From Swiss-Prot:
The keyword Signal applies. The gene is ynfB. It comes from Escherichia coli O1:K1 / APEC. Belongs to the UPF0482 family. InterPro entries: DUF1283. This is UPF0482 protein YnfB. Residues 1-28 form the signal peptide. Keywords: Signal. Coiled coil: none annotated. It comes from the Bacteria.
Amino acid sequence: MKITLSKRIGLLAFLLPCALALSTTVHAETNKLVIESGDSAQSRQRAAMEKEQWNDTRNLRQKVNKRTEKEWDKADAAFDNRDKCEQSANINAYWEPNTLRCLDRRTGRVIIP
């Protein structure tokens, strides 16, 4: 079965318009808007993974928050103790800023004003 060049060109000339005709009839223009609820399997899986990650980091977040609160309480207590030490009736009491304690000038021991 020998196909000559002229037969190939003739076949191509016949098939090309047919292919174009089919492609134009298959293509249809739609004006529909599809709105999804967002409740697809993929979005549910993503939400589950995010929740799992959030729960995994919960312990770390709690530790950071506790440490921050502890440091805040320590600074707040030191501020109150400094005020008490400076307003103390004891003339030998002084505030030591490095150790955040009220000390006796003579002995160096901690004083509770």
